[in-house]
């Protein structure tokens, strides 16, 4: 299954690969082979990147799910992000080989949507949290609020977010993606207990990131 967020890119890559392979037919067979192999691999990688496997959210209450596939880069306490109280920052790094479809971490109402232009530093560089292009999102369920950001990276220069401010969203549902390598940063409220440590892997919509 492929994500609809990638249809336009997949079509463009397919047409480009087809054109290159067709143009290569003017060369001798020995010269055509590496060209066909290269375009074939490029097309296969594109299809692999835009895969969208089925995910089933845990049937549990008072949980916060990982919004992205990847590896935990950072778990850090910080002050003043949510109602002036101590919160926990959790950063997830997505390599180009991870599934890049993002999923809702908490059921509730979308209270914040803010696009912020910026740079395109490497996503594993913690400076990218403040400097890079990103979409800032907030979800409140009446008990807690979770803030998180889709952050562009050096390769990822296209953020897709289909959320609308004021809409109600369900835990584990798809809401967007970041194309070609990136990170997601979450700010969790004081009542949330993070269950993962740096270095551990996550699966969007399935891995329980925290409980509250």
UniProtKB/Swiss-Prot annotation:
Co-factor(s): pyruvate
Q: How is the cofactor bound?
A: Binds 1 pyruvoyl group covalently per subunit.
Q: Where is the active site?
A: 182 (schiff-base intermediate with substrate)
Q: What is its EC number?
A: 4.1.1.65
Its pathway?
A: Phospholipid metabolism; phosphatidylethanolamine biosynthesis; phosphatidylethanolamine from CDP-diacylglycerol: step 2/2
Q: Which residues carry this modification: Pyruvic acid (Ser)?
A: 182
* Record's function text: Catalyzes the formation of phosphatidylethanolamine (PtdEtn) from phosphatidylserine (PtdSer).
Q: What is this protein called?
A: Phosphatidylserine decarboxylase proenzyme
Query: What is the scientific name of the source organism?
Result: Pelodictyon phaeoclathratiforme (strain DSM 5477 / BU-1)
Question: Which gene holds the coding sequence for this protein?
Answer: psd
